A protein has these predicted regions:
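Insoluble glucan recognition modules
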Residues: 1-182
């Protein structure tokens, strides 16, 4: 049998209810990206694979403190600080995985080849480029450092135009300041 994932995005004590006839229970977190419910991956992560359109606004609902979360500015812009849940998508239109990471309070975006496979760089320059390799770079901070595998913490670069990708890092925050030279 599988465990029932009772969870809430706010800390505190909660009364858990479960109806054995209808299998309805609470407190289940219900996160919506746009109009679509995100799927619980584990206790810290919810995700959805969907087509994102350049210039379109999307709303994330269900995270009470989302205004305090980091959003990858290579992928999204918060156009109105009074409405932090509304995000404008910046890169090229395509299939992406959007992950709400509660541990790091971060919205992570990954380019996808299919609903289950991460995109890779194609011969024509389309697809995705990944920053991987150790504990010296991470988003939103070094606490979420990349690994040697895109699936385990690699950073997807935003495809901003044909054959043009973008990754923004901040020395001392998302990049170990003693690990690079110019």
């Amino acid at each position: 049998t599988d465990a029932i994932p009772f969870a809430n995005s706010n800390a505190g004590e909660f009364t858990i209810t479960f109806n054995l006839l209808t299998f309805e229970g609470s407190p289940f977190i219900k996160l919506l990206f746009g109009e679509t419910e995100m799927t619980m991956v584990d206790n810290d992560n919810y995700s959805i694979v969907t087509t994102l359109t350049k210039g379109r606004t999307y709303t994330l609902t269900g995270v009470s403190d989302f205004a305090d979360w980091d959003v990858d500015r290579d992928f999204f812009e918060r156009a109105d600080v009074s409405d932090p849940e509304t995000l404008t998508f910046l890169p090229m239109t395509g299939m992406y995985k959007v992950t709400a990471n509660f541990k790091h309070r971060y919205l992570k975006i990954e380019a996808m080849k299919s609903a289950t496979e991460l995109a890779t760089l194609n011969d024509d320059g389309s697809g995705a480029i990944w920053a991987i390799g150790g504990m010296e770079v991470g988003k939103p901070t070094l606490k979420n450092a990349a690994s040697w595998s895109p699936e385990d913490g690699g950073l997807c670069l935003a495809r901003v135009a044909d054959k043009k990708y973008q990754l923004t890092l901040v020395a001392g925050i998302s990049l170990n300041a003693s690990s690079f030279d110019f």
